Amino acid sequence: MQKATVLLLALLLLLPLSTAQDAEGSQEDAAQREVDIATRCGGTGDSCNEPAGELCCRRLKCVNSRCCPTTDGC
């Protein structure tokens, strides 16, 4: 049992630790993805049921079967 515990601890020590810079980069990447989606989808009025519309409508609103930035419409 002790050998298993020591082995587990050794494996955990070998795992790379995320750094603050990694987290910051991930946040920047996520923000850029949001901008890309908003740019590509904003006000396009794609059908909510089409493949492009499905991606857009996850972030936007489906109004009268069209993807729109707000519930007020496109």
Swiss-Prot record:
Query: What is the recorded post-translational modification?
Result: Contains disulfide bonds.
Q: Which positions bear 4-hydroxyproline?
A: P51
Residues that make up the propeptide removed upon maturation: 21-40
Which key words are in the record? Disulfide bond, Hydroxylation, Secreted, Signal, Toxin
GO CC annotations, alphabetized: extracellular region
| Tissue specificity note | Expressed by the venom gland.
Q: Where in the cell is it found?
A: Secreted
Gene Ontology MF term list: toxin activity
> Which region is the signal sequence?
1-20
User: Where is it mostly found?
Assistant: secreted
The answer to whether keyword Cell inner membrane applies is no
Show the domain comment. The cysteine framework is XVII (C-C-CC-C-CC-C).
Say which family it is in: Belongs to the conotoxin Y superfamily.
Task: Indicate what this protein is called per its UniProt record.
Answer: Conotoxin ca17a
